[in-house]
From Swiss-Prot:
Substrate binds at residues 39, 187. Disulfide bonds: none annotated. Belongs to the Thz kinase family. GO terms for biological process: thiamine biosynthetic process; thiamine diphosphate biosynthetic process. It holds the Pfam family HK. It comes from the Bacteria. It is an enzyme of class 2 (transferase). Gene3D superfamilies: 3.40.1190.20. This is Hydroxyethylthiazole kinase. ATP binds at residues 115, 160. Keywords: ATP-binding, Kinase, Magnesium, Metal-binding, Nucleotide-binding, Thiamine biosynthesis, Transferase. InterPro entries: Hyethyz_kinase (IPR000417), Ribokinase-like (IPR029056). Its cofactor is Mg(2+).
Length: 263
């Protein structure tokens, strides 16, 4: 847990341009791992913030015509500042509007990580793909989708689902931790995007080990929280997840991580 230990020591400033539904949960999750979240959205202050920040999360969950240009502007400012971007194209396949905006953003700025479920990442590489809301699609071949997305966008791809897939360069990793309760809490996936950003430490081409650790820390914490005797369902799971992120230690991490490199 080298990256998490560094987060707990250095408290990296993590800027989150995220959706209105999840801001509080995302901020609290980042605080739980030791990061310092800032939910800054104004392009007018981006240049100053990005000089001292370690990463930027862009999450389009509540995309509107009013914030389109702000998102493009902050992404370009992040590029100019050498700040890595984690892009979460929430529900990109649900509407033509979302898909067109995501394509525009990815043409207008360079992102370091694209994170989404299989349906969302498929929508970025296949114009005919559709999806149901923000749900993951267990029937899709996530490894193949991730590899195709990497080939197109030349950026790290993280696909979440029952198993999580990470593709960076010539490596493809499958991670098998997590809990079904994550799908019962709104904003859990959005928090993961923020946590990935917290692990980047200003690396615009992040090491795959940072991504593996970020995803595994989150999912192992979810497992432990779900197994807690005080967890009665989604309502008690959420605060227990934050507590477990705060207390997670090396022993638990190493005992539980389930990882496989695939062709």
């Amino acid at each position: 847990m080298n990256y998490l230990n560094n987060i707990r020591i250095e408290n990296p400033l993590t800027i989150c341009y995220t959706n209105d539904v999840v801001k509080n949960f995302t901020a609290n999750g980042l605080l739980s791992i030791g990061a310092s979240p800032a939910m800054s959205e104004a392009p007018e202050e981006a240049e100053e913030f990005y000089k001292v920040a370690q990463a930027l999360l862009i999450n389009i969950g509540t995309l509107t015509a009013q914030n389109e240009q702000d998102i493009i502007a902050i992404a370009q400012t992040a590029n100019e500042a050498g700040l890595p971007i984690v892009f979460d194209p929430v529900a990109v396949g649900a509407s033509t509007y979302r898909k067109q905006f995501c394509k525009l953003l990815l043409k207008s700025a360079k992102v370091s990580v694209i994170k989404g479920n299989a349906s969302e990442i498929l929508a970025l590489i296949d114009d005919t793909a559709t999806m149901k809301g923000t749900d993951s699609d267990a029937n899709l071949d996530a490894v193949t989708i991730a590899k195709k997305a990497y080939a197109i966008y030349k950026t790290a791809i993280v696909i979440t689902g029952k198993e999580d897939v990470i593709v960076q360069g010539d490596k493809a990793i499958v991670l098998a931790n997590g809990s079904p309760l994550l799908a019962r809490v709104t904003g859990a996936g959005c928090l993961l995007g923020g946590i990935i950003a917290g692990f980047l430490f200003r690396e615009t081409e992040p090491d795959i080990e940072a991504l593996i650790e970020a995803v595994s820390v989150f999912n192992i914490a979810a497992e432990v929280a779900a197994e807690n005797e005080n967890c009665g369902g989604p309502g008690t799971f959420s605060p227990l997840l934050l507590d477990t992120l705060y207390h997670l230690n090396e022993t638990t991490y190493q005992q539980r991580i389930r990882i496989q490199e695939v062709e």
